[in-house]
Amino acid sequence: MSQNLTADKPSDNNELKPLYARSIINSFSSGTVGPFLGVYAVKLGASASEMGWFQSVSNLAPNMMQMPWGKLSDKIGRRIPFILGGGLVTAALWVPLMFVTSATQLIAVIAVQAVLGSMATPTWAALIGELMHSSKRGMTTAMINRAAAIGSLLATLAAGYLMVMIKGTLQQMFLIPLIVAVVCGLASSLVMILVNEKPHPNNASNGSIFGIRDITRHVNNSPDFMRFTKASIVFGFFMSLSWPLFSITTVNVLNASMLEVALISVIQGAVTIALQPWGGKLVDRVGRRQLIVGYRLGLILVPTFYALASSVYHLYIASVIFGIVVAFGEVAMFAYLLDVTQEELRGTLTAFYNLVTGIVFFVGSLFGGYLANYLVGIYGLVFGLQLAYALSAIGRGIGALTFTTLREPRRYPSTLRKEFREIVQKLPLMPERGPAQP
């Protein structure tokens, strides 16, 4: 294959400690507000089409500038300044959300925050890839994701409880969580100063940071990366189609409280935390492709549950399922992306992947919002949403099959079937019997 894997260098535990700290504190910051932004928009009066714009902007804006940021990072061979700057900007721009009074204002602030803060995303992925041994990417990624999930889970639960207890306007309910998001966001950025990064500029990422021709050439020279990107495009459109509808179902159909909204995220996070260490080890033993396919197939159940839900408890069940597939799937997806990108181009190619999928998510979410608006106008709120969810579920099934075309860039010591067989054999399915008695 044309792409080289990251050099096999051992990860220094002391070097990784700031990454764990950043993951926990940063996810605590986003966890206090992020899970409630869709509900915030709905309570501000957003329609289905406006929720389509909300989700579309939330997906495209973070990815618009990632390619030039990633390319610039590759050119100068530095990651920390971008992670630090992106985190500080993101934290500061939580402040305007304290004063928004309409869904349009909320969308505008989120867009600006996402564009300016996006410099941290491709550089964070590149830094992780550089600091970890290639044979331990799955396990190390799972541990970092687990640390992040713990921070987010605790923050979401605390924020949901506070919002239920605080009486007053919508802005007053969000005031304390937003202040916490600002403080933790600043802290998570400053902790990256502790990482000792040695500059390693290279000439592989040449040309203008806004250049397209050289990026296209690098992508075309990476067939495994291209195949992965194409599969993500197909699945991503149908996956994002249902995103604008989740908050509408939660608030307008099921009348969930802020604490119940928090529990939806917390349950999923708790399940993911419990299973992610095993998921990381499994990814490194059996490879990425099988788990990615299973992950994508499992996501069919999410819009299905939302379509049929008549109680918030049904969404809790969906959160359990989502937590299981995320524990294995997200680790496998991220590890595979690192596997099929060259180290010296990882920032650029990661940003390209995020940009392409972000555009797809933008189109899918916008289409889903307007489609739901049209269907709800004809068939009513519940049945109109159910039809949109059905299209998303069917499309997810078709898109999941495109990941079967992925090629593993290396061999692995086991298979999913072998691992499952070993687990079954260890289970006490039948009591042992002694010798037959006469």
Summary of predicted features, one role per range:
Residues W53-K71, V266-W278:
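Central cavity-lining transmembrane alpha-helices of secondary-active solute carriers
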Residues A159, V182-P201, G399-R407:
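C-terminal membrane-cytosol helix-exit motif in multi-pass small-molecule transporters
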Residues M163-V182, A372-G395:
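A membrane-interface helix-boundary motif in multi-pass transporters
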Residues A111-A148:
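Cytoplasmic helix-loop-helix junction between adjacent transmembrane helices
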Residues L5-P62, D224-S265:
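Helix-loop boundary and gating motifs at the non-cytosolic
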Residues S2-L16, E197-K230, S414-P438:
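Juxtamembrane intracellular "pre-TM" segments in multi-pass secondary transporters
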Residues M65-G77, M163, L275-G287, A372:
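Helix-to-loop junctions at the C-terminal end of transmembrane segments
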Residues P81-V95, V182, Q290-F305, A393:
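Structural signature of the two symmetry-related core transmembrane helices
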